[in-house]
Amino acid sequence: MIRKIKPQIRVIGFDDGTFSFKSKIKRDKTILVGVVMKGSQDVVGVVTRWIEVDGRDATEKMIEAIHNSRFKDLRIIMLKGITYAGFNVVDVEELSRETRMPVIIVIRKKPDLQAMEKALKKHFSDAEEKISLLHKAGKIKELIPGKLYYQAIGVSYDQAEEIIRLTQKSSLIPEPLRLAHMIASAVMSGESKKE
C-alpha cells in the first residue's frame, strides 16, 4: 500500500510490440518494453525483454526486468491490459507479490471476458490457467465513461485513479504506457504506432 502519492512518483509502464499471425503459428517472440518515469514528466529509463507470442513468460520477464534493473525506487507497475503478445497473460498477483509493488492495469476498451474465454478454450490447451489469470486481475472499474477503465492490485481504487491522473500528459493513457507502446511498436515495425 502506498502511504502518500507524490507528483513525481516513480512508475514503470509495460507494453508489448506488434506481431504477425505467422508469429502466432511459429511461437515467435515480440518485445516487451518498460518505460520508467517520474510522474508524467521525466523519462528516467527503459527496460526491455523478449516474450513469447501466446506464451506464458510475460510475468516472469516483467519481474526479471524490474529486479535486474538499476531502478530501485519504483513505486508502481502499470500495465496496458494483462494480455501481452497475444494471450501471454500476466499473473498480476504474482507480479505484485514478487516485486512488492502495486499493479495498475489500464484498459482503453472494456474487455469482453466471455469472448476472451471462448477464444482461449478454442485455441489453447492451457485455457483454464489463462482464464484463471484473467479473473485474478480483479474488478474492472470505469474511470472515464466509455473511454478508460482500470484494475488495481495492492492499491486502493482512489489511489489508483490519482496515480493514473498524475501520469497522464497528452493522452488518456498514462505517459509511461503511451511511451512503452510507441517504443515497442517502433522496434517491431520500424516506426511508432499511434496510441
Swiss-Prot record:
Pfam families: DUF99. InterPro entries: Endo_dU (IPR002802). Belongs to the UPF0215 family. This is UPF0215 protein TSIB_1161.
